[in-house]
């Protein structure tokens, strides 16, 4: 991912595919200190630009905290890899990725288009 962070890139993937991406925030891996700094409000300006760009395409459910949302818009998550794979192949793909990248995780799923491009849960 480049500077659009997880939500920005998910937003672009969803629009480009005409589908809805469901992000399960509890499954997104972070560096241990990231939460602490975001909770104190230490965010780069790019996080606010990313929010401005994508937030109309994001529906937040299940009381996802503002801190979690901030982290998911944070461009410092750059360098990650966002992949969409068939659900039937997800576990096998994850196991293979985790051999090289232990923190790799399934962070969501894709459905046909719903009320918005991204559903953040």
Residue ranges of predicted features:
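Glycine-/charge-enriched secondary-structure boundary and capping motifs
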Residues: 1-121
């Amino acid at each position: 991912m480049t500077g659009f962070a997880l939500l920005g890139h998910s937003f672009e993937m969803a629009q480009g595919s005409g589908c809805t991406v469901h992000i399960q925030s509890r499954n997104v891996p972070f560096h241990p200190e990231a939460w602490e700094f975001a909770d104190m409000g230490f965010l780069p300006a790019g996080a606010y630009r990313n929010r401005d760009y994508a937030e109309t395409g994001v529906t937040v459910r299940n009381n996802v905290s503002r801190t979690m949302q901030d982290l998911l818009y944070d461009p410092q998550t750059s360098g990650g890899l966002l992949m969409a794979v068939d659900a039937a192949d997800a576990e096998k793909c994850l196991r293979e990725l985790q051999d090289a990248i232990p923190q790799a995780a399934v962070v969501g799923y894709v459905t046909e288009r719903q009320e918005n491009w991204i559903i953040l849960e």
